[in-house]
């Protein structure tokens, strides 16, 4: 409700420079395949496309089909590699340009670039950095393919990991987990889909930013509020303590945690679930 369908930046640019735009619901559609044959592309570039290309399309261009994938393959094949890199506490991520085959991100690797993941970096921040790095790497790879200077490197199947679709149940914060794990979850799901906890009154509180504090709270129950003052609030975890820096009550905008504490009178000793 209230959401408007908007064209992508790629389509907007293509229309502006009079490039043909094809948007088949199914890439296996015979009419689409015939049009692709008529266009006779030298190379097909794929990015964030949610369908498998049929072999007939993969074999069509003389330089093949290449995919821009936001992970250091063979790690995190699949739909959500950026989320999972942060969720799993990785210290670096990257972009791989790969030659496509009929599998899911299984093709030979052409070129890679890596970036460090800082301890407070969010999924949105990593996405934006990889977007810039990936675009530059794609242009370089196309030049190298044209010059015949790129060497395809097969992936090691024994090192493959997968980044499956993000589901709604992954948004809930389980305070029995460690502070590090919860901090990674919050970073991984910012800005989408977000994480939440349940307040003592039963309402949801989204948590957007956090920080792992030194020390522990072994005598406290997981989810228990240890401090609530002008600086925000600290929560006991299964291991360690997590400081909430930014949150969002139901029906309101995101705010600094200290603003939430000042307005809600959240009390030390209360339990979040």
Give, region by region, the residue ranges found by the protein language model:
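One-carbon transfer enzymes
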Residues: 1-191, 240-243, 249, 261, ...
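An anion-binding loop in the catalytic cleft
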Residues: 176-273
């Amino acid at each position: 409700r209230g959401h408007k369908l908007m064209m992508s930046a790629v389509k907007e640019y293509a229309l502006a420079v009079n490039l043909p735009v094809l948007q088949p619901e199914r890439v296996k559609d015979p009419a689409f395949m015939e049009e692709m044959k008529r266009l006779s592309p030298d190379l097909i570039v794929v990015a964030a496309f949610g369908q498998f290309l049929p072999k007939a399309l993969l074999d069509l261009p003389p330089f093949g089909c290449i995919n821009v994938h936001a992970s250091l393959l063979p790690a995190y094949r699949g739909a959500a590699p950026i989320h999972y890199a942060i969720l799993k506490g990785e210290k670096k991520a990257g972009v791989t340009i790969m030659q496509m085959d009929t599998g899911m991100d299984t093709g030979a690797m052409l070129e890679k670039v890596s970036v460090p993941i800082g301890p407070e970096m969010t999924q949105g921040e990593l996405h934006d950095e990889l977007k810039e790095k990936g675009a530059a790497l794609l242009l370089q790879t196309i030049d190298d393919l044209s010059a015949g200077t790129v060497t395809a490197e097969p992936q090691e199947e024994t090192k493959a990991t997968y980044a499956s679709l993000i589901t709604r149940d992954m948004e809930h914060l389980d305070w029995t987990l460690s502070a590090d794990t919860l901090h990674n979850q919050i970073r991984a799901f910012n800005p989408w889909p977000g994480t939440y906890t349940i307040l003592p009154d039963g309402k949801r509180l989204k948590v957007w930013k956090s920080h792992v504090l030194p020390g522990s709270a072994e005598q406290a129950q997981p989810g228990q509020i240890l401090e609530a003052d002008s600086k925000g609030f600290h929560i006991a975890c299964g291991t360690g303590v997590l400081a909430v820096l930014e949150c969002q009550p139901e029906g309101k905008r995101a705010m600094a945690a200290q603003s939430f504490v000042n307005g809600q009178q959240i009390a030390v000793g209360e339990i979040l679930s």
